[in-house]
């Protein structure tokens, strides 16, 4: 996941939540983004990278700060049958307006039913509101 901060301060207090197979309440409710990415206490203020988790880009806690973090669940899978929804709050109590970007990988066994048609690409692309300092 990558983050571009649109305001000063720490972006990483948003809780991670995993909703399995249509749950109304999450089966997994974490304690903060930095904990989910296994880098508590602001990732130690410096980049790090391991096989299953890391923070290769650690920016300043300022408007325009850029961060990139990752975690692979090879050693801690989250099983589901029909659906898995993963969310991360944008700051504690969803009180931040930063830009978050993410990607998820899933390994499909064969055979499988046909997948639904994806919306047009212009409908799937995020609307980006760049931070003022990031443009300087």
Predicted regions and their residues:
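Beta-strand-centric surfaces of beta-sandwich/beta-rich domains
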Residues: 1-136
């Amino acid at each position: 996941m990558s983050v571009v901060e649109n305001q000063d301060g720490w972006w990483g207090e948003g809780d991670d939540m995993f909703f399995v197979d249509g749950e109304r309440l999450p089966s997994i409710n974490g304690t903060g983004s930095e904990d989910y990415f296994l880098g508590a206490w602001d990732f130690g203020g410096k980049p790090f990278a391991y096989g299953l988790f890391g923070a290769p880009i650690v920016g300043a806690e300022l408007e325009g700060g850029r961060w990139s973090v990752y975690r692979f669940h090879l050693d801690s899978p989250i099983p589901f049958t029909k659906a898995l929804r993963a969310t991360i709050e944008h700051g504690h109590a969803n009180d931040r307006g930063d830009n978050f970007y993410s990607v998820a990988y899933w390994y499909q066994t064969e055979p499988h039913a046909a997948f639904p048609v994806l919306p047009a690409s212009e409908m799937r692309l995020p609307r980006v509101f760049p931070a003022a300092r990031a443009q300087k």
